[in-house]
Amino acid sequence: MKTPRGSVLVLLLLNLLRVSWAQSNCIRPSIPGIPGIPGKPGSDGKPGTPGTKGEKGLPGLVSHLNENGEKGDPGFPGMPGKVGPKGPIGPKGVPGPPGVRGPKGESGDYKATQKIAFSASRTINHHQRQGQPIRFDHVITNANENYQARSSKFTCKVPGLYFFTYHASSRGQLCVDLMRGRAEPQKVVTFCDYVQNTFQVTTGSIVLKLEKDETVFLQATEKNALVGIEGANSIFSGFMLFPDTEA
């Protein structure tokens, strides 16, 4: 079907008018559109230059804070601190009172008891010098060998209580000293008896607490009529009573 030539011309004219109208609209100012969405804040700018020094301020008010106030109430006790290190050992205390007496112990074995005893007689019949040990040269008994016949001295080897005795025959006055000690023995007792031109028997005894290495012996004095003959013997004896359990 053919289109009329007049219709085509009309269409061309309309297109030309539209183009010219559009061009005229582009030349004239347009109306502002709707504002867009605000953008994100920009990054911080660089620091500005220092400002000028300000003027001096006014003087401040005088404060009274340095004055001490009234004493406050005591605070609450604090928490206990940690346990400190162990201190040094203190001085030794005074001895306590004696304890109660313990029960009686069992019977001991008599065989285990120290056996110390001696007995020696004098067989020498010559004058004994003053200040010298009286010689008892003949050993009768010497359990544990604590008596030395050569020196006529008893030497303590086991500390304890000891009993000593002597029986001396004499013709005239007689005095003897019983001596004890270590390097320098001391006189303990003196036994004397006085008669003239007749036989007599003098005796004496003593209990001593001896320490280890102490000696015991009889010593002659200026009154010395001691004899040692058959029928008129002189004897020196001793034995331990009890050992010292604390030694």
Swiss-Prot record:
| Activation/inhibition comment | The C1Q subcomplex is inhibited by sulfated molecules, such as triterpenoid sulfates, heparan sulfate, or chondroitin sulfates.
| Location(s) in or outside the cell | Secreted; Cell surface
Q: What PROSITE patterns does the entry give?
A: C1Q
Q: Where is this region: Disordered?
A: 30-78
Q: What broad class describes the main subcellular location of this protein?
A: secreted
Keyword Zinc-finger present in the record's keywords: the answer is no
Please list the residues that carry the modification 4-hydroxyproline: 29, 32, 35, 47, 50, 59, 77, 80, 95, 98
**Segments forming domain Collagen-like:** 39-98
Q: What biological-process GO terms show up in the record?
A: complement activation, classical pathway; innate immune response; inner ear development; synapse pruning
Provide a GO CC annotation, any one. Answer: glutamatergic synapse
Query: What GO molecular function annotation could you give as one example from this UniProt entry?
Result: identical protein binding
Source organism superkingdom = Eukaryota
> Which is a Pfam family this sequence falls into?
Collagen
Q: Which residues carry this modification: 5-hydroxylysine?
A: 53, 56, 71, 86, 92, 104
Domain description: The C1q domain is the ligand-recognition domain, which specifically recognizes and binds the Fc regions of IgG or IgM immunoglobulins. The collagen-like domain interacts with C1R and C1S proenzymes.
Query: Mind telling me what this protein is named?
Result: Complement C1q subcomponent subunit B
**Source organism:** Bos taurus (Bovine)
